[in-house]
UniProtKB/Swiss-Prot annotation:
Disulfide bonds: none
Protein name in UniProt: Parafibromin
Mod. after translation: Phosphorylated. Dephosphorylated by PTPN11.
Pathology linked to this chain's protein: Hyperparathyroidism 1: An autosomal dominant disorder characterized by hypercalcemia, elevated parathyroid hormone (PTH) levels, and uniglandular or multiglandular parathyroid hyperplasia, adenomas, and carcinomas.
Keyword Methyltransferase found: no
Result of altering R91P: Found in a patient with isolated hyperparathyroidism and parathyroid adenomas
Pfam families named among the record's database cross-references: CDC73_C, CDC73_N
Tissue expr: Found in adrenal and parathyroid glands, kidney and heart.
Subcellular location: Nucleus
Amino acid sequence: MADVLSVLRQYNIQKKEIVVKGDEVIFGEFSWPKNVKTNYVVWGTGKEGQPREYYTLDSILFLLNNVHLSHPVYVRRAATENIPVVRRPDRKDLLGYLNGEASTSASIDRSAPLEIGLQRSTQVKRAADEVLAEAKKPRIEDEECVRLDKERLAARLEGHKEGIVQTEQIRSLSEAMSVEKIAAIKAKIMAKKRSTIKTDLDDDITALKQRSFVDAEVDVTRDIVSRERVWRTRTTILQSTGKNFSKNIFAILQSVKAREEGRAPEQRPAPNAAPVDPTLRTKQPIPAAYNRYDQERFKGKEETEGFKIDTMGTYHGMTLKSVTEGASARKTQTPAAQPVPRPVSQARPPPNQKKGSRTPIIIIPAATTSLITMLNAKDLLQDLKFVPSDEKKKQGCQRENETLIQRRKDQMQPGGTAISVTVPYRVVDQPLKLMPQDWDRVVAVFVQGPAWQFKGWPWLLPDGSPVDIFAKIKAFHLKYDEVRLDPNVQKWDVTVLELSYHKRHLDRPVFLRFWETLDRYMVKHKSHLRF
């Protein structure tokens, strides 16, 4: 259900009638009390910890009815009628919204609780006196109409009396009609039956025609069905055709496994092998069925009890595989291993070997006293405007562990044309959670001043100095132009970015200089990253 302010705006724009009855304001089939609060915030409230106040429906409706008056006259008249006044800063904005000149207003609080209007019945009921007057009216009957009704009823009764069968008048059919006339009537009845009733013979003829039609179509449809292929997609392949879902899944897994493994190496024909006469090929022995008396084929050498041990051999310089395979395997020379082509799916890197990320990383201080924090990092680096962290907290922004900003820049094409592209940058304030391989992607760090900011970092000197860190990562320091520079920052290789307290139009050049400095550094030292 819409709020009362939106309903009032709709009625005001469409010039609909707003009915004020007692302490209620009626909008068609809905009504609200006069003192109901809207979601329009009173100017000057809701700041510095003060609770928000909202204009009532009565005060806004009184403003619409007296919009032609000047503000002082309107204030005096509202005070006379004891109605809250719409303040002067809100007057123009509120009237613009109610008249349809603006689609919304900054003073409208969408999170304010809505007052539900009462629904009124739209059925129009007659008054009790009208009902009584209607009941007291005498019913005038036309004598002519009554006479006609009586005549019509008498004629109907007379016709019914004539239609009564009298037994004295019943005669035999042979007495009333001749034999030829009776035969003619029977012939007509039979002809009518043949034309309206379908016999069993007709059913047999129709079924025979349909069967011949189906037989003629079988040959045509058989050829079509033989060339049909079932269309399989990611969705249909997961839909089981039977009650047992495992049959479909196992069949898919077997086909995927067979495709991944490819053909076995021994089944692949050697590409450079010379053609061999089929008559010279030795047939592979076919394993016979199990026979409990066929123990002789498991019998080996008597002296070694079938363990294929060469008593005249030596184990010097041999591997375990050559020992287990026996002497015959040691004597045969193993051919040089040919490179076996791998399937296309195996040529890809395994899933655990992911391709390294090329997204640059920017580290900012985790302290709340820093000018750049996780609350306003996107405003500073992406939108190029400075918004204090305290203001972001008042807006209800939540702090995140890391954020991804999209930097917009112009990139030159080979033809000399420039196109606008966006480049992602990862911003973090907890560098100790970075993986060892992530430090190669760290391109910039915002320095706050104290050296303990770099505790636990790589490349930190034993005395705690971050000089080597600044040799590998570009460092920046953000401060107000009226604040004195930190002594540690003066000693370090840090680019200082100064912001004005009040001149917000100077923020964009400062952050553009940050990106230009970072681009020059990345071209020289981090050219493998995406920027």
